Amino acid sequence: MEQSVANLVDMRDVSFTRGNRCIFDNISLTVPRGKITAIMGPSGIGKTTLLRLIGGQIAPDHGEILFDGENIPAMSRSRLYTVRKRMSMLFQSGALFTDMNVFDNVAYPLREHTQLPAPLLHSTVMMKLEAVGLRGAAKLMPSELSGGMARRAALARAIALEPDLIMFDEPFVGQDPITMGVLVKLISELNSALGVTCVVVSHDVPEVLSIADHAWILADKKIVAHGSAQALQANPDPRVRQFLDGIADGPVPFRYPAGDYHADLLPGS
């Protein structure tokens, strides 16, 4: 029981394959309640897939994925729908509705899932926009926003229903240093102010480790390391060092496997 209380998400011995490719081989990880957890690893390792497993969008081949003590893969469709209201996902693209202004984008989940009277809905939306610094942009369309503003608008929508869990899929990708700093600050402040549990998938090592309470590194279908930022920086595992230090060649090779070089230089080879 204590395990369920301490960890909002608890993945136990989870395996998942896509076609003939094994993505995860018997992995286990936990997401402590009210903390910021980072998921890191090389491109194509399955980090976004892990978020989809937690959200119940796809099911594992075997293993348990507990959310607040309930096994997500075993839930009925109606129960999963109810539980998902306690989760929110910030997509890499932001995924704003292009035909709605910023206010209506943030109001959308409130209109879909609550019966708030119009004045209270208005106040709630404006408070969420104020939290991300976009109250003055409420009437703008997504096409009028910069990339960073669009991410912040999407974040305001993600917190509209005050979820227990927010999952961030590469929130810092393609952002300039100022916007990246703003997003790092917002994630940290929302975690502190609301007590919301955050899972952040990111390649941006310095930024995500600066706010993560705990981090997990995926490689070779497994969890290869986990711990605090300090513990990971001291980890000597070559796979960890290559990823954290950005080393070009190592366990993840620089060159794609190929045949004899001289033979390939000949025409018709």
From Swiss-Prot:
It is a peripheral membrane protein. It is an enzyme of class 7 (translocase). Disulfide bonds: none annotated. The keyword Cell membrane applies. Disruption phenotype: Mutation leads to accumulation of phospholipid in the outer leaflet of the outer membrane and increased outer membrane permeability. It confers sensitivity to SDS-EDTA. Its EC number is 7.6.2.-. Its main location: membrane. It comes from the Bacteria. Keywords: ATP-binding, Cell inner membrane, Cell membrane, Membrane, Nucleotide-binding, Translocase, Transport. It is found in: Cell inner membrane. It holds the Pfam family ABC_tran. PROSITE patterns: ABC_TRANSPORTER_1, ABC_TRANSPORTER_2. One of its GO terms (cellular component) is plasma membrane. Residues 9-245 form the ABC transporter domain. InterPro entries: AAA+_ATPase, ABC_transporter-like_ATP-bd, ABC_transporter-like_CS, P-loop_NTPase. SUPFAM superfamilies: P-loop containing nucleoside triphosphate hydrolases. The keyword Cell inner membrane applies. GO terms for molecular function: ATP binding; ATP hydrolysis activity; phospholipid transfer activity. One of its GO terms (biological process) is phospholipid transport. Part of the ABC transporter complex MlaFEDB, which is involved in a phospholipid transport pathway that maintains lipid asymmetry in the outer membrane by retrograde trafficking of phospholipids from the outer membrane to the inner membrane. Responsible for energy coupling to the transport system. The complex is composed of two ATP-binding proteins (MlaF), two transmembrane proteins (MlaE), two cytoplasmic solute-binding proteins (MlaB) and six periplasmic solute-binding proteins (MlaD). Belongs to the ABC transporter superfamily. MlaF family. This is Intermembrane phospholipid transport system ATP-binding protein MlaF. It comes from Escherichia coli (strain K12).
